[in-house]
Structure formats: structure tokens, C-alpha cells
Amino acid sequence: MRRPLAVFAYDFDGTLAPGNMQEHAFIPDELGMAHADFWAEVKVLAEAQRGDSILAYMHLMLEKAREKGLELSLDSWRKRGANLPLFPGVEGWFSRQNARAEALGLDLRHFIISSGNRELIEGSPIAPWFERIYASAFMFNRHQDAVGAALAINYTGKTQYLFRINKWTLDEWDNEAINAVQADRDRPAPFERIAFFGDGLTDIPVMRVMTDHGGHPVAIYDSAKPYTEAAAAQLLKDGRARLAAGGDYRQGSQLDDLAVEILAAMARGVRAELFE
């Protein structure tokens, strides 16, 4: 008998890793500019074009890379992501949670839902743990060089991927299965068995959906940056997150203890369903 699906979904920047990934893997070292200046240009471009800030940052990354003569191949982007800094304990987190879930009779899967660069995340050491990496992605030509944006995931776009997971229609390009009628009881990953870990404003719509549908939204903060803890506290106060913890993924941390509680609650829900 197949074990019931359970899902841990994560934002990346500020959730699994400190700061913005582009600031560690691209902007200061290769572009030779301050990250604040880069993001200021993104804002100006998005406003001037009345466009999306995710598309704006992706456009500027490619434009400035071409001006510098930087390599744009898929492999080069993944190499840039290989040394992304992660919060303490992240690399050991996934196997530990999987073992706990299995002991409870659950089949735990991990997903990324991020506005950051998919190619950078694919190059990180934790990439193999994810069922899918839903993140903004470049379009590549036949030479495998980035030529434009293939996928941009902004703060509201993130909610789409919750429903893809919920209905287990995982292909980004599939517009039919995701819109097909499917009763809640028939969905492979009900929201009650989904936890979402996120850190900021771009995660608010996702957290709202999670809260409204009985999921487990968790606000993550960087203990080294007090303003992020204040932001997490505000998410709790506003009813957007149900739980909050610092970005310490080591065994025995507050966040690890919350994961134990969440998995136990998911397992109790499965048992309750058996008697309905």
C-alpha cells in the first residue's frame, strides 16, 4: 500500500539560504557592481516598463552579462550556484525529515517555490532532494546559452505551484490538468499535508492560501538580522503564518522541533480520515 503523500515546500532566498542568491553567485563578483545598485536598476526598469520586477531582474542579468562578455551557458549558471551559502544544518535536514515521515507512514516530498533563479538552485548541493524546483528560469537556445526568460515566478505566481502540488499536476507547461475539476478528497497532496516555509513579502499570498486551506505556513527568519525576526513576528500577528522559527535546520533546533510537530499533525490527520 502506498504511503500518503506529505509535502514540505520552501522559498529559497532568506529561507534555506541567507540573502538573495544573485548577490552571492553573480552580481558583485562577476558584474562588478554593488547589489544595491543592481536592484535599484531593476526597480527603475520595472517601473519604466510598467512590468514585472522578476522579468526586469532576469533581463538585466542577461543584458549586463552580455556587456561583460560573461558565459551564459546552462552549465555556467549551475556552476555559479554550486557555492551558494546555506543556513546551518540545511544539507542534513532532508534525510532526517524523510526518515521521520517514513516512521509515521508518510511519503514526504520536498519542493522549491522561489522567485530566484532555477539554474542557480539546480547547481546547489541540495538540488537532488527536491521533487521539483519551481523557480524563475531562463530560456536557452540550441547552443544551451541563455537568451531570455522562460518562466518568471512572482509573489502571486507562487500560489499556482501550491495547487500544482495539491493536484499533483507538476509540469509547469501543463495548462489543462491544473484546471481540470478534481474534488478535494481526490487530490493526492491535500493542503493539510503541505507545509510551506518562507520568509517575506513575496511569500504572503502563498501563506494566505495555506492558512485558508488548513496547511502549515511557517515563517523563517535570519537570527543574525533582527529585522527579519520582526517581519516573521508580523506574519504571525497578521494571521499569515501559523508558526515561526530561525533559519537553523540542525537537529534539535526550534525549527527542527516544529517539523516534528508538523509531521505528527499530518499523520494524525491521515488516521482521522480512515474513520470518516
Residue ranges and their predicted role:
Residues G81, P85-F111, S115-E276:
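C-terminal cap/substrate-recognition subdomain and adjoining C-terminal extension
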Residues M1-R142, A241:
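Alpha-helical substrate-recognition element adjacent to the catalytic core
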